[in-house]
Every structure is written in structure tokens, then in C-alpha cells.
Curated annotation (Swiss-Prot):
Disulfide bonds: none annotated. One of its GO terms (molecular function) is ATP-dependent DNA damage sensor activity. Keywords: ATP-binding, DNA damage, DNA repair, DNA-binding, Nucleotide-binding. SUPFAM superfamilies: DNA repair protein MutS, domain I, DNA repair protein MutS, domain II, DNA repair protein MutS, domain III, P-loop containing nucleoside triphosphate hydrolases. The gene is mutS. This protein is involved in the repair of mismatches in DNA. It is possible that it carries out the mismatch recognition step. This protein has a weak ATPase activity. One of its GO terms (biological process) is mismatch repair. Belongs to the DNA mismatch repair MutS family. The keyword Glycosyltransferase does not apply. InterPro entries: DNA_mismatch_repair_MutS (IPR005748), DNA_mismatch_repair_MutS-lik_N (IPR007695), DNA_mismatch_repair_MutS/MSH (IPR017261), DNA_mismatch_repair_MutS_C (IPR000432), DNA_mismatch_repair_MutS_clamp (IPR007861), DNA_mismatch_repair_MutS_core (IPR007696), DNA_mismatch_repair_MutS_N (IPR016151), DNA_mismatch_repair_MutS_sf (IPR036187). This is DNA mismatch repair protein MutS.
């Protein structure tokens, strides 16, 4: 085995299951099984070393500048990659170049700009569940204190390497999936020994099993204290069951240190999520309401986030997504945000000026993360300088504002004048990504560098003049001076002119069509030029290191600046939407009243032409009705109406204005939406089972302060079963929970509940019939609907005319209530079709035989008390009744 392959195997052993990208000169190479895997995933050519040997070594590679491109493909395919770099200059190396693994890249540990979506956060999360013994103990304690979690909790921590954000919290185990859906991590760590956490293979994030020692309590606390520079963790707010959150946070930090092999100085605080309660939204509701992603395509476009995101900075866009994923439930905190939005709505010029300034800033959050982890380059530092240059104008426009939020943001925009001046004077306007590319320090910044550069440039001019002089003296017109790393500078002469070579030319290399020479004079100047070049490069690298270190010293204050820029952008974005689309400021209350006048669906309000969307009111109170039963035909707008109420509530609690003419909203603690039909085939659950599971969660966890949205509950089973369930669910919500509820249903029978339940009110969607056509008015009116108009909707959907006409015929026969001898509805076959049964009719058994009067008579007869003759007579009578039809039976 060669020394290089021995070095490779040592690195491979250290990186575990990650594919190893091994730097060799200008290429990254993969060997053995890694090469075979990568060739298939990345489309690389699979070749081999030592092809003539008995066991050639499989290999594949790519140019070093394509690293980001191939890392991205690999991560998307679910793999991890270890990057092994050359950590010394090959020219200075004595023997084998020293190499080290500088980082391990996984879905949750991306920092490079080319690997990240600028508008999306990229979280690494960890889950920790206590042991069975600890769980049982906690459950006993919870029983004594009436803890709603029952003591069955998990710790979840999440961090973003590209920003330094770090949070953790304690959550009921039942909410694990919901919380992960809220966070939206790219990768989730779980303890390989914990059988109680079941990684969901259908999740949008990847799962990584970690050893139990990485969750050790003592190590977690020690590591976190050191990282955060605190003596203990008591001041962070992790109290009841807080150890599970601490252990999850420790696992995150352990993984980051293991994979990054460098500084994590931008992780300066750990936020206790439980200190700031937020509106609870389960995973199903997030999907149903399409808050951040559409259900059909999974994209931002068409979702609520997509239409309200008018941010002009990447960090503002990410913060807005965070706010929308976790709306507030504290009235003061909501008002704090809304006041700032209000001030921007009222001042168009101010808002426009601020958005213009923000548009010239770069992604400071992620730039600082690369500074902290030691992966920054000259272009990053230049972009930090440009961002700092815009701060004075931004700070001036935020000065002396009425809003407490804007006042605080102005105070957090630290100008850092010394750092800004240094970076601006040091760096060229156009800088390379990597410091190794050189030529990024501005002329005049460093006199020593300027001298070395001038010397190098002067030497190169001399070489050009020397070439011309040799051409003139020798008469060789095509003589040229060249350079390579082996021979340095040389004179190249074609074979046709070899006879003209002067005596002082020393031959160094013979090629097919030419020969290469050196001269003492040429070598002397070469040493001067190369020495000046190398010294200039070394000086420039040293200056870059100083700039990077000085920027690193400002890390904490610059992170505060980045957050202030992002929040300013979020507030201005919400104000921009409100001003453009005439949204209004909602009034937030702590009671259960919901009063929306002229409400509009926020997505449709923005995407449809102005005036096209039909606004509707929604009033919920103990006096007018807390449960609104909405009936009406499909396509009339029932689902849109109930969704818009939920989204308006969510926007209000985010701190946004809302699409309405006025809105008074009692703050909700939870929003539930059981909307739409979908199955979970991968989990073995039918559409109806999914519907019932989601409904059960609502009934078990909703409170009187919750907002519940139900759409067509019970349609996945038989008519009577579905109606019975819908009826009982409505009663339970009314009697046991008292939550504000909007229930869109096709069961018109539910309208009768208004007569018996005082807080139930009927609404319907207005339609107009004209010449066998149905016109949907999309207007919500009091009262229940009396028709479903399903056949008309089917025609609008493109159902063939003959099918539609046959449906009308069948409907007419069903409404006429024709029945056979067993009391089953009968349908005559279409003309030209011969029936199979007696009387050429179809018998429908929608409700089974159990309701037939003859069956009921047989069930009640006492056979044991009958004589054989009496039994025979009963049978004869039953047969006669059966032949005579249902009326004879009833008579």
C-alpha cells in the first residue's frame, strides 16, 4: 500500500459512514466502495488505480471547484460527506502532503452559500425521550400536580449552523410530530438505543441515529456551559423536566463539534422555547391550511407565506417564515409587532425608503456564520462591508419612531464604523470567493504588499522585453518565453530554427516539434519575479487573516445587527402587503368573540384581481353562536370560507394586518383544521381512518379558547354512520369543549341541532337557479341549505351528458321512494338495458335488511312457545306478506 493510500484509509476510518472526498491537487477523489456509490449518484466516471494489478482500486473524482455542486446532489440523496483537505502547501511539504478532515457535511450542517436556499432555514434537530423508568416516575409526579402532559414528555433541540440560532424545549410526547413539523428541520438526531422514538421514513427530513453517550446528561451540561460561557444552566429557564431539553441540546452541540472540526463561536445563547408560548398548530392543520407550503406541490408559491412574503433580504424571509410557523398568544407581544406594522402602513415614504436601503444589504446572518466557522472568503468580508455601509441611512430613518419595536430595532443597528472603514479600505470592489485566488486587497491599503506587487509586475515586464530582445538577436521570429512548475521560465524554439541557437542557451527539454532552453540571465530574473509573487501572495493571505479575525471579534454585535435588519424587513413586508391590498389592523381580545366583517381569503385576495373575491362576515360569540354549521353545494365556497377565518386569525396573531373591513379576534390558543381527504398508505391508514385520527386529536386536546375548522366530517363511511358521527362530534364540541367551531357539512340533517343546542347557528352558501343552471354567489347567509346541487356540479366538472342525465333519472326515482317487497329502493334500468331482477328493476341495499318490518317481526316472535302447526302457519303468513310487498307487511 502506498503512503497516500495509507493516509486515505486513516481518514476513511475517521469519518464513519460518510463518503470521503479526498483532495488531491486540483481534484477531489473517491476510492473503493465510496467511488462506486458516488459514481452512480453523481454521474461520475468510475475508473481505477493500478489497472494492471490483480485488485485494482476503484476511483472517481471531479475538479475542486465543483465541490458544492456534488455535495448538494449527495445530500439530497440522503448521504453524508466528509471533506478531507490538503492543509499545507504542496510546495512546502516534505514528502506526503498533510491532509485532514475539515468537516463532515450532512443535511442539517450546511453552511456554504451554494448548498442553501436563501429563503429557507436549515435546522439540525435532536430528540431525547427519557427511559421507561424515568417516564413512570414522571407520570406519578404529574398525577399529583395535574400536569396536562401526564409526565410523558420529550426534549427537542434545534440549531442552525448557518446562523447560530439555538433553541430547546420540553414537549408532550404526543406533540412530537407536530413540533417537528413546526420547526421543519433538515435532519433529526435520535438515540440509537431508544426504541420509543420511531423515525418516520415519510418525513421530509432525514433521520440520523446517534450513540447513547452523545445524550449523556453530565456531558451535555458541561459542554453547553463551556459553549455559552456560563457557570451553570439554571438561568436559561429549563425547569420542569428541563433535563430532557438539555440532553437534546447537548446532542446537537456534540454532533456539530464532531462534524465541523472548527469554531462554533456564533452559538452564544440557548433559548428556552417554553418561556414564550405560541399558538399550537398540529402537522395536519399546517398542511390543510397551506400556511408555508401548498399541499399539491409542496412549494411556497400559492401558500400563505408565498403571498405575504414581500421581504427584500434573505434573512427577513426566513424570519417571516418562523413567525408564521409559530404565531403568538400573548396580547402584548402581538401588539408590539402590530404597532410597528401600523406605523409603516401609515407612512408610505418611510416604508419605501427603508425597503430600498434593505434591498442593498446581503445575508449578514449567514456571512457571520461562515466567519465564525472559519470558512469565510474575501467576497464574504466585502459583502459585510457593503451591508455595514447601508446602516447609517437605515438607522436615521428608524430614529424617533412611535412604535416601541422600531425604537428598539434602531438601537440595535450598531454602525461598527472602525470595522466598516477597515473592510472598505482593504478590499477591492470585486473580490474572489476564496482567499487562495488572490488579488483582492486594494492598492494603497498596505505599502509592503504594493512594493511586492510592483516588483512582480516589473519582473514580468522585463520577461516580455527579454523575449523580444532574444527574437531580435537570434532572428527566430517564433521564439517565445514560457513557464511551467517543473522548469520555471524557459525559451521555446521550434526544430526548424535549432541551428540559430546561441552558445549561452542551455537545453532543458526536447519535445517532438521544439526544444526548450534556459539562460543564466533568465533564471536570475525568474527568481526575483517568483519570489516577489510568493511574498505578495503570502502578505495578502496574512492581511486577509487579520481582517477575518477583526470581523470575528465583532461577531456578537453583528449578530444583533443581523437580527434587527431581518425584523425590520419582516415588519416592512407585512406593511407592504397591507397597504397594497387594503388590509386592516385587527383588534385582539382575551375573550372568545370572533367578529370579522368583509373577510377575504388572504391568498385569493392577493392573487385574484381586485374586487373579484366575494367578502363574507363571520361572527362567533356565546350570544350569536359558537358553532357555525355551514351547508351548501360543493364548489359554492364553504371550504374557502372556513379556511379564510382560520388564516385571518393566524395572521392577526402573527402581528399582521388582515384582509377584512374590520376584525375583532379573541386570541386562540390552538387552531385545528380537519380539512380535505387524504390517505396514509405508507402507514396503513385509509382516508376515513386519517379523518377519524385527526378528529380524535381535536376532541381530546381542544380547549374553549381554540378555533376548530371541520370540513365534511364523516363522508368516508356510510351515510348513517357519517351523519351519526358528525352529530355526536358537534354535540361534544358544544357541551364539553365550547371551542369556536366552523363546520362545513353536506349533512343537511345537522341543521336541526340549532333547535336543541343554544350556541349552534346555521349558515349556508347562497346559490341561484336559472334555466336548470346553478349560479354560485359565494355569499354566506343565515339558515341552512335545502339542496346539494351535486348533479349540476358534476356537469360543470365535465361529467359526460349521458351520465348526468342518467343521474337525474336515478335521483328522481329515489326521491319518489319506490321500493320492492323487502322495502329496498328500486331503480329502473336505463332504456335499452334489460334488468336482471324481477320486474326489471335494480334493488338498492343502501341501508341493509335490518330495517325491514318482516325481519323485525321474525326477531320478536317466541318460537319456543309455538306448536309445530303454529310455526307452519306463521311461515305461510310471512311468505304471503313477502309476496304482497312492503305495504302488506306494514299493514
Amino acid at each position: 500500500m502506498t503512503p497516500m493510500m495509507r493516509q486515505y484509509h486513516e481518514a476513511k476510518e475517521a469519518c464513519g459512514d460518510a463518503l470521503l472526498f479526498f483532495r488531491m491537487g486540483d481534484f477531489y477523489e473517491l476510492f473503493l466502495d465510496d467511488a462506486k456509490v458516488a459514481a452512480g449518484i453523481l454521474g461520475l466516471t468510475l475508473t481505477s488505480r493500478d489497472k494492471d494489478s490483480e485488485n485494482p482500486t476503484a476511483m472517481a473524482g471531479f475538479p475542486h471547484h465543483q465541490l458544492d455542486q456534488y455535495l448538494q446532489k449527495l445530500i439530497r440523496a440522503g448521504f453524508r460527506a466528509a471533506v478531507c483537505e490538503q492543509v499545507e502547501d504542496p510546495k512546502a511539504a516534505k514528502g506526503l502532503v498533510r491532509r485532514e478532515i475539515t468537516r463532515v457535511v450532512s443535511a442539517g450542517t450546511l453552511t456554504d452559500e451554494g448548498l442553501l436556499d436563501p429563503k429557507e432555514p436549515n435546522y439540525l434537530a435532536a430528540v431525547f425521550a427519557p427511559s421507561q423508568k424515568a417516564r413512570e416516575k414522571a407520570q406519578k409526579e404529574a398525577a399529583k400536580t395535574n400536569d396536562p402532559s401526564g409526565g410523558d414528555v420529550v426534549g427537542i433541540a434545534w440549531a442552525e449552523l448557518s446562523s447560530g440560532r439555538f433553541e430547546a424545549g420540553v414537549f408532550p410526547r404526543a406533540r412530537l410530530d407536530d413540533e417537528l413539523a413546526r420547526i421543519g428541520p433538515a435532519e433529526v438526531l435520535h438515540c440509537e438505543d431508544d426504541a420509543s422514538v420511531h423515525p418516520d421514513p415519510t418525513a421530509t427530513w432525514s433521520w440520523t441515529a446517534r450513540p447513547a453517550w452523545s445524550y449523556a446528561a453530565a456531558d451535555a451540561e458541561k459542554s453547553l456551559c463551556k459553549q455559552l460561557s456560563v457557570a451553570n444552566l439554571e438561568g436559561l429557564g429549563f425547569e420542569d423536566n428541563g433535563d430532557v431539553a438539555i440532553r437534546a441540546a447537548g446532542a446537537v452541540l456534540c454532533y456539530l463539534k464532531e462534524t465541523q472540526r472548527g469554531s462554533l463561536d456564533h452559538f452564544r445563547s440557548l433559548t428556552c422555547h417554553n418561556r414564550s408560548p405560541v399558538l399550537q398548530i398540529d402537522a395536519a392543520t399546517r398542511r390543510s391550511l397551506e400556511i408555508t407550503r401548498t399541499m399539491r406541490t409542496g412549494s411556497r408559491e400559492g401558500a400563505l407565506l408565498g403571498v405575504i412574503d414581500r421581504t427584500v433580504t434573505p434573512m427577513g424571509s426566513r424570519m417571516l417564515a418562523d413567525h408564521l410557523a409559530a404565531p403568538l398568544i400573548d396580547a402584548d407581544a402581538i401588539t408590539y409587532r402590530t404597532d410597528a406594522v401600523d406605523e409603516f402602513v401609515r407612512n408610505n415614504n418611510l416604508r419605501s425608503d427603508i425597503r430600498t436601503v434593505l434591498g442593498d444589504t446581503y445575508d449578514l446572518t449567514r456571512l457571520l456564520a461562515r466567519v465564525a466557522t472559519g470558512r469565510t472568503g474575501p467576497r464574504d468580508l466585502r459583502q459585510i462591508a457593503v451591508t455595514l455601509s447601508g446602516l447609517p441611512a437605515l438607522k436615521a430613518r428608524l430614529a424617533e419612531r412611535d412604535s416601541a419595536c422600531l425604537t428598539r430595532l434602531e438601537s440595535e443597528l450598531h454602525l461598527c464604523p472602525e470595522l466598516r472603514e477597515q473592510l472598505e479600505s482593504a478590499l477591492n470592489d470585486e473580490c474572489p470567493l476564496s482567499a487562495a485566488d488572490g488579488n483582492f486587497i486594494r492598492e494603497g491599503f498596505d505599502s509592503e504588499l504594493d512594493t511586492l506587487r510592483e516588483l512582480a509586475r516589473g519582473g514580468k515586464r522585463w520577461i516580455a522585453e527579454y523575449q523580444q530582445r532574444q527574437m531580435d538577436e537570434t532572428g527566430i521570429a517564433n521564439l517565445k518565453v514560457g513557464y511551467n512548475r517543473v522548469f520555471g521560465y524557459y525559451l521555446e524554439v521550434s526544430n526548424a530554427h535549432k541551428d540559430k541557437i546561441p552558445a549561452d542557451f542551455i537545453r532543458k527539454q526536447t519535445l517532438k516539434n521544439c526544444e526548450r532552453y534556459i539562460t543564466p540571465e533568465l533564471k536570475e530574473y525568474e527568481e526575483k519575479v517568483l519570489a516577489a509573487d510568493e511574498k505578495a501572495s503570502s502578505r495578502e493571505q496574512m492581511l486577509f487573516t487579520l481582517l477575518r479575525e477583526n470581523t470575528h471579534k465583532h461577531l456578537a454585535i453583528l449578530q444583533e445587527v443581523a437580527n434587527a435588519i431581518a425584523m425590520t424587513d419582516v415588519v416592512a413586508s407585512l406593511a407592504e402587503v397591507a397597504a397594497q391590498h387594503h388590509w386592516v389592523r385587527p383588534t385582539l381580545t382575551d375573550d372568545s368573540v370572533l367578529r370579522i366583517e368583509g373577510g377575504r381569503h388572504p391568498v385569493l385576495d392577493v392573487t385574484m384581481a381586485q374586487g373579484e373575491f366575494v367578502p363574507n362576515d363571520c361572527i362567533q360569540s356565546p350570544e350569536t353562536g359558537m358553532i357555525l354549521l355551514i351547508t351548501g353545494p360543493n364548489m359554492a365556497g364553504k371550504s374557502t370560507y372556513i379556511r379564510q377565518v382560520a388564516l385571518i386569525t393566524l395572521l392577526a396573531q402573527t402581528g399582521s394586518f388582515v384582509p377584512a373591513t374590520s376584525a375583532e379576534i379573541g386570541i386562540a390558543d390552538r387552531i385545528f383544521a380537519r380539512v380535505g381527504a387524504s390517505d396514509e398508505l405508507s402507514r396503513g391508514q385509509s382516508t376515513f381512518m386519517v379523518e377519524m385520527v385527526e378528529t380524535a386529536r381535536i376532541l381530546n386536546t381542544a380547549t374553549s379558547r381554540s378555533l376548530v375548522i371541520l370540513d365534511e366530517i364523516g363522508r368516508g363511511t356510510s351515510t348513517y354512520d357519517g351523519l351519526s358521527l358528525a352529530w355526536a362530534i358537534t354535540e361534544h364540541l358544544h357541551e364539553q369543549i365550547g371551542a369556536r367551531t366552523l363546520f362545513a357539512t353536506h349533512y343537511h340533517e345537522l341543521a336541526a341541532l340549532q333547535e336543541t343546542l343554544p350556541r349552534v347557528a346555521n349558515l349556508s352558501v347562497a346559490v341561484k337557479e336559472w334555466q336548470d343552471e346553478v349560479v354560485f354567489l359565494h355569499r354566506i347567509v343565515p339558515g341552512s341549505a335545502d339542496k346539494s346541487y351535486g348533479i349540476q356540479v358534476a356537469r360543470l366538472a365535465g361529467i359526460p351528458v349521458e351520465v348526468n342525465e342518467r343521474a337525474k333519472d336515478v335521483l328522481a326515482q329515489l326521491e319518489a321512494d319506490h321500493r320492492d317487497s323487502l322495502d329496498r329502493p328500486t331503480i329502473a334500468p336505463p332504456s335499452g338495458v334489460n334488468g336482471k331482477g324481477s320486474g326489471d328493476t335494480y334493488q338498492l341495499t343502501l341501508f341493509g335488511y335490518a330495517d325491514h318490518p318482516l325481519i323485525q317481526e321474525i326477531e320478536t316472535v317466541d318460537i319456543d312457545s309455538m306448536s309445530p302447526i303454529q310455526a307452519w302457519q306463521f311461515l305461510q303468513e310471512a311468505k304471503a306478506k313477502l309476496s304482497a310487498g312492503p305495504k302488506a307487511v306494514k299493514g
